[in-house]
Amino acid sequence: MKIKLFTAKKFWLSISILLFTLPNFAQLRLPKLVSDGMILQRDVKLNIWGWAKSNEAITIDFKGKTYHTVANAAGEWKIILPEQKAGGPFEMQVKSGKEKITLHDILIGDVWFASGQSNMELPMRRVAPIYENEIKTSECTFIRQFFVPQRYNFKQPENDLPNGKWISADPETVLDFSAVAYFFARNIYEKYKIPVGIINASLGGSPIQSWMSEEALKEFPSYYQEAQRFKNDDLIREIEQKDNERINGWYSDLRKHDEGFQKDLPWFLPHIDTSDWPTMTIPGYWSDTYPDIQNGSVWFRKKVEIPSRLAGKPAKLILGRIVDADSVYLNGKFVGTTSYQYPPRRYEVPANLLREGENEIVVRVISNMGKGGFVPDKLYALIIDNDTIDLSGEWKMKQGAKMQPLAGQTFVRWEPVGLHNAMVAPVTPYRIKGFLWYQGEANADKPYEYRLLLPKLIENWRVEWNQGELPFLFVQLPNYGPPVSEPSESNWAVLRESQLMTLKKVPKTGMAVAIDLGEWNDIHPLRKKD
């Protein structure tokens, strides 16, 4: 009897699991963009679309009116709503048979599709040190962002996003907003007092061809052929497996051979004998001082005196930017780590770690491409309350392990078409006001080609959204790179010219000139509001 009971339980459990895991295309479903808190584009006809049972009747109730359609044989449906004036909040009900979805807190205003690479992706938290007041005063339910998940698909355009939601700006949530897009939205809102929505589809390091459709890239045979190549899942797995094995092996060997971890007293501990350690002036690159030291790990340490009035207080340890990766210790305690060169190093020092008198900072730096060190003209300091202790100057240093250069990896997600299919295509039915674009750094190695690629991207997107010549606003690349005393060749200058030519050639485009907003030593300048 017990056996029969157990078998019955297993049977019903199996049935339950099967029913739960069956595809839900037969159920009423909306795309992730059409959800609570969405901002709809004013003054244009609106697409509301989704999925249901095949041939099922669909109704939408919105602002006192009802709209009808019938799902096709595949269960797809779309209802076109008439033009709406700015306002809200509103509710919308979508019904199919006995199923009903109610959407809350809908606003109507202007919606902008913001895309590009890292300078568009760069969130407000990265620029927080110079915009503290703007963050404190950011609360505004009429400014919202929808962050598109960062994914790729080389085989076909997708029709929905895996997740995502509309988020209103406030001092906490705004930290994850694109800084460029947020300040743009804030400016529009303050001028016109209408809701502003940002659909943020951006990814650091991405070249322009990754955002273009397969059809558009037929005019660029090398990119089109590359897109075909990456339809092969086995190829992607092989590339990623080999890259991962090689990279993991390099870092494993580095750790294994690092003298700083071989001793009874690891080098991150205080009171290590450093009598044979040479010195180096920080900031700077160690190969400029010690040409024989290139790739691998190098340990740095510096002693600082803390007065009794500051002892035990929390602090901020600011270490500018470091190439490539670093791990930081204070008085033998781990404080933080950063795995690649671009983010600013801002580490929180907890209370009770700093002591009166002598304190010691240790930084283990990893260089994998031959130019490791501390980027010049950045702040290196320990900040406690209103006191700033300068950390530039002489540091003790010693190489932990010498390594061969680590060859670069293939970033599959940057290959042609992939981001378009997964991050652009699902958004194209959603009505928008226009496009915001900050990109070009990743194409600077072929700057003349950009004067063909950028106009084609604009044409490509305008065709796909099917809203006519939607405004396309973009940022011209800012100044970047070491100052030179004589005129010289510059790919960035040529790419800026390509951007200018696009402005002159393509109607309804706008270009923000940012030549005075860059930082020579940082590809991610902070001044995103200006």
Task: Show the residue positions of the predicted features.
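Short beta-strands within extracellular/lumenal beta-sheet-rich domains
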Residues: K32-D36, Q294-P307, R345-Y347, N421
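Ser/Thr-rich low-complexity repeats and stalk/linker segments
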Residues: S35-I108, M369-K371
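Aromatic-lined ligand-binding clefts that engage carbohydrates, nucleic acids, or primary amines
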Residues: W49, W277, V304, L310-G332, ...
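Beta-strand-rich ligand-recognition modules
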Residues: G64-G87, R321, V328-A381
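An acidic-aromatic loop/edge-strand motif
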Residues: I101-S168, I199-Y285, E358-I432
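Loop/turn elements at helix/coil->beta-strand transitions in domains of secreted/extracellular proteins
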Residues: D110-V111, C140-F142, Y192-G197, E358, ...
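Alpha-helical scaffolding within the catalytic cores
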Residues: P344-R345, R413-P426, L452-N460, S490-M501
